UniProtKB/Swiss-Prot annotation:
This is UDP-N-acetylmuramoyl-L-alanyl-D-glutamate--2,6-diaminopimelate ligase. It is an enzyme of class 6 (ligase). PANTHER family: MUR LIGASE FAMILY MEMBER, UDP-N-ACETYLMURAMOYL-L-ALANYL-D-GLUTAMATE--2,6-DIAMINOPIMELATE LIGASE MURE HOMOLOG, CHLOROPLASTIC. UDP-N-acetyl-alpha-D-muramoyl-L-alanyl-D-glutamate binds at L24, S26, T151, T152, S178, Q184, R186. Catalyzes the addition of meso-diaminopimelic acid to the nucleotide precursor UDP-N-acetylmuramoyl-L-alanyl-D-glutamate (UMAG) in the biosynthesis of bacterial cell-wall peptidoglycan. Coiled coil: none annotated. Keywords: ATP-binding, Cell cycle, Cell division, Cell shape, Cell wall biogenesis/degradation, Cytoplasm, Ligase, Magnesium, Nucleotide-binding, Peptidoglycan synthesis. It catalyses: UDP-N-acetyl-alpha-D-muramoyl-L-alanyl-D-glutamate + meso-2,6-diaminopimelate + ATP = UDP-N-acetyl-alpha-D-muramoyl-L-alanyl-gamma-D-glutamyl-meso-2,6-diaminopimelate + ADP + phosphate + H(+). ATP binds at G109, T110, N111, G112, K113, T114, S115. GO terms for biological process: cell division; cell wall organization; peptidoglycan biosynthetic process; regulation of cell shape. Belongs to the MurCDEF family. MurE subfamily.
Amino acid sequence: MMTMPLSKLFAHASRDPLIRELTLDSRSVRPGDLFLAVPGAKVDGREHIADALARGAAAVAYEEQGANVLPLTDVPLIPVKGLIAQLSDIAGRFYGEPSRQLNLVGVTGTNGKTSVTQLVAQALDLLGQRCGLIGTLGTGFYGELQSGRLTTPDPIAVQSTLNDLKKGGARAVAMEVSSHALEQGRVAALEFDIAVMTNLSRDHLDYHGSMEAYEAAKAKLFAWPSLRCQVVNLDDDFGRRLAADFARRPSVDHIETRLLSYSLESPEASLFCREAVFSDDGVRATLVTAQGERILRSQLLGRFNLSNMLAAVATLLALDYALDEILKVTPQLQGPVGRMQRLGGGDKPLVVVDYAHTPDALEKVLEALRPHAHGKLLCLFGCGGDRDRGKRPLMAEVAERLADRVLVTDDNPRTEDPSRIFDDIRPGFTRPDDVEFVAGRGEAIAHLIATAAANDVIVLAGKGHEDYQEINGERHDFSDLTEAEKALAAWEAPHA
């Protein structure tokens, strides 16, 4: 068990007990722990200092600004100005600076983070470098993920997880880095080696307020002092701006950091794909690089997944793998759970479950699946409650324009009235009377699949891998994959 004298973390502490663990949650405190009491969006940890002490905390560090009366105790209570901003550094020191001992890949962007990190991790495993994962689907190693609630965990959990992965044999970690995490300093003390940008489109404006603020949060990762390489998408406006910013830097910066770009459209990119042939089995494309032309093969569906694959290939090049070595493993790489995941097909409808919950992501999924729909292309979607209301009609516009039939249902209503969410979505349709609105996601999925033809393709968008539905603040067991499997099994009987 790791322990550290308190003085190694706070030199001015009144006493110097051995610290066994760090925690932000008073309920998880055990004897010997350091409780870090900070104000949060919903709960102020400083109000729970007494609880932490009762549970055996060896010391408490708390945010000094705005602190109220503290309990009387012999346990060290350490006031710290700006504690939240220092959490990542404190945890890094406690856990032995694990990011310095790993090839740390940070992937950011509106869509594609999960796919790219999983592709990178699978490829590195196949190439002999064990790679850990931190992201939307959880933390751990590929195929053995422990689920979590946040794309990027809190600053303590991030450092602790990196340390656990290192001890578990990881030499690299592919990590999703959300705009929230960058803005809130959750990864502030990490030493990223590679920064990857997938794309930028409308999302999280309920938090950031504007696209400019959202972009500024994402851009922070590409100014990281420890970077060896930036990987950017030239098919995206933000990616082109990052590349232009890099080109304007003093040449001395380019000695320490290089830039690799990828594109399906621009021959100027470091990795440029042309002559892509898409089929039900995936894609075969010509890859144009400074090393000459190669053939890239992938089993993933869709043009946007080819872009994700290019991001992964560029990342592996940044980690000094040879291109020919990389291209030997790309045909083996699989997509993540709930990302363009296929069920059915053959003599029954093809159902595709995808996490697409932004207008841009939904557009890419529907465009990718249109060639596979030999009948009609059907789309089911909803919009999450307590999130950006402005994107709701935009989702409707995309679905109506690209699908033959649209059904709107609940996503995660959270604390919002589902009917109000429907009301926000409806104005995005030019022909709302042609659209089905069905409350109850399970019922909606069953209805859409039951009424589909065998040669139709059905997109269930928005929830992907999620195994719950959040209603009135409570998470209920629910899975699009499970509901689709049940509906496909029921579909066989009347059509047999």
